[in-house]
Structure formats: structure tokens, C-alpha cells
Amino acid sequence: MRAIWLLAVLWLAGCQHVAVAPPPAGEILDLRNGQVLTAQQLLMRLAEPERVIVGEQHDNADHHSVQLWLLQALDEQRPQGSLLLEMLTPEQQSKVDQVRRAATPPADLPEALAWQDGWDWNLYGPIVRFALTQPYPLLAANLDTAEIHTFYRNPPVLKGERSNAAPVKSTLLEQISDSHCGLLTESQMPAMLAVQQQRDRRMAERLLAAPTPSLLLAGAWHARKDVGVPVHVLDLGAPEAPTVLMLAEQGSEMTAAMADYVWFTAVTPKQDYCEQMRKQFGK
């Protein structure tokens, strides 16, 4: 009983003021003019727009440390309106809301949220735990599994001039092929592209509907200004695209067409995802 009481105290304590730790290390650039920024200068710039997207490398722990710092530090600049996660689906939203309303935290938070195994809880857990103690909503931004299967089998017509531009589609097709290690057949590519763009469209819709100032955390390709969610935000009629901060490892190619700002972090050891994928494909 005492353990449960202590958990409740800690849970409620999260609703109070959080002392923001120093920012994680890294080199920050304004890609529009090449200016080197301090973390505080970046913070001031990100506090102004209504909508911000932060692109990540999913398995990079430094990126999630930066995201948590940004979430906490931005709230010091102005009240946060909402946080959206690519890692949450619509079918999880009611579970998220239920946990937020609870007087005490669940004994097993990932289980209570039906957290998907594909997203490493050790990396995302601190962000989710913090967000659940705050007054603003934590919102799902992705598609449900059933929707993905539907879009794969019957790709819908995507409306919008920018998202249908040939350079956008060709760039995404190349990325899809590379990320699947060249194991996809040509016949699979249109359906895979449709799913990717429907994910981007959903995130754009959710971002536009969310209370502002809003922050979306998503994979780098979803975040990109030239091919990802920002393109769909404009196709949906928004007067301006969201501001994009890309988190990237040192040495990564990053241009002003891709993002407004970049926060370079240390290079991490690469996992051989292609080897894992070849085993799944039996090749």
C-alpha cells in the first residue's frame, strides 16, 4: 500500500513545476542561413510558431533526450498546447486519456497504453511519462493497423498538388526501397508509397486539429519539409508549413529544403537492420 501511495505522490508531483536540466550536447544550426545557435537561441525560435515538428532517428537515445529537454524547456517559454506522437495510434487514444484522468498511475504503464513493442519503451518512456503528468493532451498521430492494411490493399487517391509532385514521390520511393534493403518487389512499391503518404497525411490532419502551440515527434522522413508532413499541411490548406527541427547524427546531409533547424548529435553504432530484414524475408 505504501508503494502505491508513493507512486501516486510521484505521479501528481509531475503536474508541478519541473526543473529543466541543461540541454544535451550537440551542434545546432539554422539551416536557412548557416548560423550556429545555442540551445537557448533555438528554444526562443521554436517558442514562436504555432506548430513544430521534431524529426528523429528512432533508435538514437540522444535524440529522445533532446526531445524531452525541448518539451520541458518550451513549456517554460509559453504554455504547451499539445504533444503528438507518431508512436501512438487512434485505437490507443482512449487508453492514453484514461491514464491521464487517473488519480494514480497504473502499475504497468506500457501495458495500460497498449504500447507497441516496435517502439523501444526505454527510449520513449521518459517522454510519455512526463507528458502524461502535464495539463495539455498527449495525442495519437499515426494510423491504426487496420487502416494501414486497407491503404495497402486499396491505395486511395491522394489529393493535393504538392504531395503528388513527381520529385516527392520519386524521393519517397527511393527511401522506401533503401529502408527495406532492396527486398521489396516493384509491384509492392506503389502500395508502400501510399501507406507512407497516408501516414504523413494523417499526421498533418492531426497536427492541424491539435491545440496550439503543438509539437509533433516523428521519424525524420515524416518530418522533412520537402516530402513529409509539412507538404501535406500545405496541401490541406494551411497558410504556412510547420517549423521543422531535425535531429541528426554528425555527418548527416541536411539542407534548408529538408528542415529549418538541425541539432547534430554524436554518431552512434549502427545496427544491421538489413540482416534482420533478410532473415524475415528468408533471403
Task: Give residue spans per PLM region.
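Bacterial N-terminal signal peptides
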Residues: 3-14
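Compositional signal for N-terminal targeting/processing segments
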Residues: 15-283
